[in-house]
Amino acid sequence: MKERVLASIKRGEVVILPLEHSYVYACDAFSLSAVNRLHQLRNDPQGVAAQVLIGKVETLAGLAQGLTPEINDLAREFWPGMLTLRLPQNQSLNWDLGDGGTLKEFAVRVPNQSETLEVLKETGPVAIASATFAGSAAVTLAPKSSEMESLDIGELTAGPLSTVVAVAGENLTVVRVGALTFEELRKVASAIELASE
């Protein structure tokens, strides 16, 4: 099953992968046609950027710019896990996650899901979006599809969303509190702030 999923990603196709609490559509982050297909499957509005998954902390340095010691500390402490970092992307990156390259930033994490981590270590960065229509609830069962390969590990346990930290220069701001609390993050990065409502 893993080999078929890997082959599909390398061919520029969309697959279904499990995360901690839901299934997602996934594809090679550098394949524009695959990223476009991913957004079509979800009926995403124009300009929506996919999130990125990587298989290890070390990959981040090649994708993001302006990595500070605090960002690296957060990544090492909470990855694999439920921390999403929203970072300025490396200027040399040749990808379009669905925003036409206008955002100049991307959201990334290393998931704590062993089967998916095995895939990521062989594929490099993948673009993902929830395996459902935009705005719908996350899915805990892998959607049945004859058109795409699926790494189906059965029903997943529903759970909280990841916590999202936005990075702007030296400033770290929690823009969504999810599985990780603000207090947990502040123990690692004391200067982190909580976005005002």
Language-model region placement:
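Active-site-adjacent structural elements in enzyme catalytic cores
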Residues: 1-197
